[in-house]
């Protein structure tokens, strides 16, 4: 059973040899011919458990492991993995590959073998992502296997590509960010990544997907002091478009920075409350 109260408290005493003791399972799955490595954090108690894929940002220096543990304590499986071409995973890094890897992760979680081995409740599958992970989350929020999605300060690479042909300031800022992220990435460059955004801007731009997204259960958190996923660019445009079709978008504005550095517990509480509401929906 999922219980949001465990965001801020430890679970009751359990014996280490209890088969339902929390665990971390090292695992791997294949995405377009490449082996991806990851871990599944499994919670206390008997399953099946609601399960979320937790997607890190670009390139992944800001690791949301605290969020993974908080949600695991609440009673949820959490799958974490690195994208192709990042952090020692073989293959080439690209935003397109990241998108494909997310679909591969969903396929993996819904495979009969994974469902059995990890006690997965396939009626309660969720996507949670920060920054680039939020962008990836919103790209797959309409997948019918996903019950609801959480985007934490999503950074819209599609929008950057779409406006990059006429907004030199935003293009230059994005390019400089790409340059700082290359160390853990394989076979790419800031130039390659920027060109990929420019080539795919019309296809990836999230506001253009607003009609479809308006039919989904989505929480977006927004950091008021965020200088990366700037609100006026990466949230307000998208939210305005979604609200033209439906009012079911859940927004949470938090006075913090892009990493939620001083509000980690608050963002975890916010997400846990949203997930509990979704899990309790039939």
Q: Predicted regions span which residues?
A:
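Alpha/beta-hydrolase active-site loop
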Residues: 93-119
């Amino acid at each position: 059973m999922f219980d949001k109260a465990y965001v801020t408290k430890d679970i009751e005493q359990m014996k280490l040899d209890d088969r339902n003791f929390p665990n971390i399972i090292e695992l791997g799955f294949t995405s377009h011919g490449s082996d991806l490595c990851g871990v599944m954090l499994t919670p206390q108690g008997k399953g099946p458990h609601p399960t979320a894929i937790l997607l890190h940002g670009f390139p992944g220096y800001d690791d949301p492991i605290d969020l993974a543990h908080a949600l695991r304590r609440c009673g949820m499986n959490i799958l974490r993995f690195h994208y192709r071409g990042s952090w020692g995973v073989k293959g080439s890094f690209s935003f397109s590959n990241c998108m494909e890897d997310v679909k591969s992760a969903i396929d993996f979680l819904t495979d009969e073998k994974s469902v059995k081995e990890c006690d997965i409740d396939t009626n309660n599958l969720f996507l949670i992502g920060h920054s680039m992970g939020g962008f990836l989350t919103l790209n797959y929020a309409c997948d019918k296997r996903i019950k609801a999605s959480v985007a934490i300060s999503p950074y819209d690479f599609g929008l950057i590509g779409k406006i990059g042909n006429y907004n030199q300031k935003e293009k230059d800022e994005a390019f400089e960010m790409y340059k700082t992220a290359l160390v853990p990435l394989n076979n790419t460059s800031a130039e390659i990544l920027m060109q990929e955004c420019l080539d795919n801007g019309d296809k990836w731009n999230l506001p253009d997907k607003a009609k479809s997204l308006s039919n989904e259960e989505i929480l977006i958190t927004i950091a008021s002091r965020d200088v990366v996923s700037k609100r006026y660019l990466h949230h307000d445009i998208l939210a305005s478009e979604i609200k033209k079709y439906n009012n079911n978008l859940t927004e949470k504005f938090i006075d913090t920075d892009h990493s939620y550095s001083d509000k980690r517990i608050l963002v975890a509480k916010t997400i846990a409350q949203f997930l509990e509401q979704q899990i309790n929906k039939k």
